[in-house]
């Protein structure tokens, strides 16, 4: 099994999560320069802002970086075209099926890596010709399912013949090692990067996170009754 850094051309087998309203071009570039795969979070942007952030990231790093597209975004179609036009190397997706974009992205040489919260979804997406999946457990700060990372990752590893990236509650080398032991090729991290110097959130936000000894992350959820 190849490690994620071998697949992506990065120094470390780590992807920075594409956190909406946080993961700017500057932040993604800083993460890429540090050895991870920086990801621009398109979720809080419009088409023009996304293009500007991609170009800014290119100015700040010569390392690989990617874009995260939330497929429920009203400008998802435009985002899908912009990443092709701007020569983005990796796209991660969430909140929808990327199927209609995969042929265009693959023709442009883009690696396509959807986020999944269940093995059955990973199996379905594998048929589309994607490059890898991010198995994101409920510990994640993002929009996820109900299964914990420790249980989800080996299920997805067993279900698909694709590289699997673990996400959800991963913050240090011990958890990276655990993810590799579960069969993942690397990890995606988000919440733990919020307190980095390069992260653009307010210093009070960072201080609150560092003082939170019980709940370091609070998942974002939408309950349908």
Which stretches of residues belong to each language-model region?
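Active-site entrance/lid segments in N-terminal catalytic domains of soluble metabolic enzymes
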Residues: 1-159, 163
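Generic alpha-helical structural context detector
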Residues: 29, 207-211, 221
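Glycine-rich phosphate-binding active-site loops on the catalytic face of alpha/beta enzymes
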Residues: 36-45, 135-145, 170-203
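C-terminal helical cap(s) of enzyme catalytic domains, especially alpha/beta-barrels
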Residues: 53-56, 196-212
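Catalytic cores of alpha/beta
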Residues: 120-128, 151-152, 165-166, 170-187
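Single conserved hydrophobic/aromatic residue that forms the stacking wall/gate
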Residues: 214-225
